[in-house]
Amino acid sequence: MQTGLSLACLVLLCSVLGEAALRKPKRQAGATDTNGAAKSEPAPVKTKGLKTLDRGWGEDIEWAQTYEEGLAKARENNKPLMVIHHLEDCPYSIALKKAFVADKMAQKLAQEDFIMLNLVHPVADENQSPDGHYVPRVIFIDPSLTVRSDLKGRYGNKLYAYDADDIPELITNMKKAKSFLKTEL
């Protein structure tokens, strides 16, 4: 049931993203430059409902925009990449997000020691879903771009899942990801 629901959510998400990608931005009527040619000016930004890269996971954290950017920054900065897979309307994802934001140690580690990425859509790299496409799940990648399969949550059936009550376990794994990097180099 859970796998079927997750798959249905992914299919729906993909169709919505595909439809949004096909839409073209509209030009403002009457906008011309000094030669009378139409100017392509961006539409005014609406602040209500504005989506930011943090998606509520911590506004003081610098977030990578894409998986590829996160991998490049991890390698360049010699820091581990922490990828949080979630859905914005998933109650488990929402609860984990609130707990993550409320925990000062988790926020501090994320700000100082990690390249951070949160994704609401699947990536093509199957290493990001070694045991399924469930959410929320957290995957760590070291600067050599190796997925840290040893850094798991406490569940046997969903190895990389974390609940809101699992923040101490997540922090432990964040510290392991960071300290492993230092002993390895």
UniProtKB/Swiss-Prot annotation:
Q: What induces it?
A: In response to organizer-secreted signals and neural inducers.
Residue segments, region Disordered? 25-45
Please list which residues make up the signal peptide. 1-18
Q: Which GO terms describe its cellular component?
A: endoplasmic reticulum; extracellular region
Picking any one GO biological process from the record gives: fibroblast growth factor receptor signaling pathway
Q: Which InterPro entries match?
A: AGR/TXD, Thioredoxin-like_sf
**Compartments, record wording:** Secreted
Keyword Secreted on this protein? yes
> Would the keyword Signal turn up in this protein's UniProt record?
yes
The source's domain of life comes to Eukaryota
Q: What family does this belong to?
A: Belongs to the AGR family.
Functionally, this protein is described as follows: Involved in cement gland formation; probably specifies dorsal ectoderm to acquire an anterior fate such as cement gland and forebrain. Signals via the FGF pathway.
Tissue pattern of expression reads: Expressed in the anterior of the dorsal ectoderm from late gastrula stages onwards. Becomes restricted to the cement gland anlage at the onset of neurulation (stages 13 to 14) and expressed exclusively in the cement gland from stage 18 onwards, with transient expression in the hatching gland during tailbud stages.
Q: Which Gene3D superfamilies match?
A: Glutaredoxin (3.40.30.10)
Name the Gene Ontology molecular function terms of this record: dystroglycan binding
Q: What is this protein called?
A: Anterior gradient protein 2
What's in the keyword line of the UniProt record?
Developmental protein, Secreted, Signal
